[in-house]
Amino acid sequence: MTKNIHKHRILILDFGSQYTQLLARRVREIGVYCELWAWDVTEAQIREFNPSGIILSGSPESTIENGSPRAPDYVFTAGVPVLGVCYGMQTMAIQLGGKVESSNQREFGYAQVEIKADSALIRDIKDAINPAGEAVLDVWMSHGDKVAEIPADFVTVASTDTCPFAIMANEEKRFYGVQFHPEVTHTKQGLRLLERFVLGICGCEALWTSATIIEDAIVRLREQIGDDHVILGLSGGVDSSVTAMLLHRAIGKRLTCVFVDNGLLRLNEADQVLEMFGDKFGLNIVHVAAEDRFLSALTGVDEPEAKRKIIGRVFVELFDEEACKQEQVKWLAQGTIYPDVIESAASATGKAHVIKSHHNVGGLPKEMKLGLVEPLKELFKDEVRKIGLELGLPYDMLYRHPFPGPGLGVRVLGEVKKEYCDLLRRADAIFIEELHKADLYNKVSQAFTVFLPVRSVGVMGDGRKYDWVVSLRAVETVDFMTAHWAHLPYDFLGRVSNRIINEVNGISRVVYDISGKPPATIEWE
């Protein structure tokens, strides 16, 4: 019998911080299931979820503004431990009788927190001892307001020079507030502090591991699907690949994967997908060779959004055609992951807690009436990759750089033609190969080549050539919301340029994109 991996669970109430999903990922990393809901949940919803503990997130808002978000009152009467982080600490203080004020000295960045009193939250956790003999924590602050007065039944656990209440606690009720962000890596002992709260104070067991997630998913898939057949659109990307492997382990040959080769994939990618999933893992794959259909639909179209829509529409049409041939199929599987669920959820305040399906494949014929199977919908991307490794998928495939859904359709600028795609595929393969050789591939977050539909004069031997231009793009980023261009070595860039111009007949010039995000986007289209 499988363990109930959802037995202990943490509820994180989201007040809008950029770090909230990171907070949830840290709790999962500790080995405990958690969910992320908007701050405006009802008492009934919290009771139904039955959390072992509650965490109140940070927020870009100010607790002293009229109408700023507050935690439901039930949070403080539910009888479970509560941890307030930054804004979460401030709203806890206000709601329990304390005071918050705007600070003249805002704290953004590193700070040293001095421990003033013992607390279960940080006992034996420290980075150093200061000259006064106090334990010190190196933390990451990001706040303008600060708690000016803690609630009557709380004690001051830690402070900084400018923030008198950096940690507050009510040990009896197991309520804790920290003015810093324990979820970011800059707070050196942050994970230990969260671990102490989740495992020690809330009493959760670390049941949430890659192996137990797989075991649980297989049991649930078998219960949901029974003896029915399932269809899945397999792209070779991380989410659909892990979905395919999980379903294959659960129901074997009753899974049919439809792989649509749109002619917009990377060099040899179609062969690699078919070889890995068909030959190596023995999945049942329907290969749809559709390059002509996609390129024909894209003829004369040069506007990026129009190209995206056409590629999406043609994919859905092809998938529908194949799905209709599979008469025994009763279920459609999708690689929806937890951030998709969070994004597509909405509440009265425009924040997320109402869980709705996020459709990766839309527009299926109404007469098909397929049920939906989403085995990854509770998982973050890093968790999906880890269970992919556990299921036997290769590291290089799971951890390769992101590739856009429309593929080369948005990396060939302007109108998409077969000639352009073929040139781009070969140039991009050289760039990626050289990054691996130089041990630079995993040091950048994303790298790729873009085809520019302009010709440039070049010289080869005694002759002149008038051929196409490609741009290399490599960026470094944490969250893909902002990015810096990667400062790759000049000799490396020179080597890549020489190889592309010499080995790819039809390209006469290679340039390197040194634009950050913002103002530029990572992809060119």
Curated annotation (Swiss-Prot):
Write out the entry's keywords from A to Z.
ATP-binding, Glutamine amidotransferase, GMP biosynthesis, Ligase, Nucleotide-binding, Purine biosynthesis
Q: Where does the Glutamine amidotransferase type-1 domain start and stop, copy by copy?
A: 9-207
Q: Name one GO biological process term.
A: GMP biosynthetic process
- Every copy of the GMPS ATP-PPase domain together lies at 208-400
**Known EC number:** 6.3.5.2
Which pathway does the database say it acts in?
Purine metabolism; GMP biosynthesis; GMP from XMP (L-Gln route): step 1/1
Catalyses: XMP + L-glutamine + ATP + H2O = GMP + L-glutamate + AMP + diphosphate + 2 H(+)
Catalytic EC class? ligase
Under the heading Pfam families, the entry gives: GATase, GMP_synt_C, NAD_synthase
Q: What one GO molecular function would you report for this record?
A: GMP synthase activity
Q: Where does ATP bind?
A: S235, G236, G237, V238, D239, S240, S241
Give the active-site positions. Answer: C86, H181, E183
Q: List the record's Gene Ontology CC terms alphabetically.
A: cytosol
Subunit description: Homodimer.
- Relate the protein's function as given in its record: Catalyzes the synthesis of GMP from XMP.
- NCBIfam families to which the protein is assigned, alphabetical: guaA_Cterm, guaA_Nterm, PRK00074.1
Q: What is this protein called?
A: GMP synthase [glutamine-hydrolyzing]
Organism, scientific name: Yersinia pestis
What is the organism lineage in this UniProt record? Bacteria, Pseudomonadati, Pseudomonadota, Gammaproteobacteria, Enterobacterales
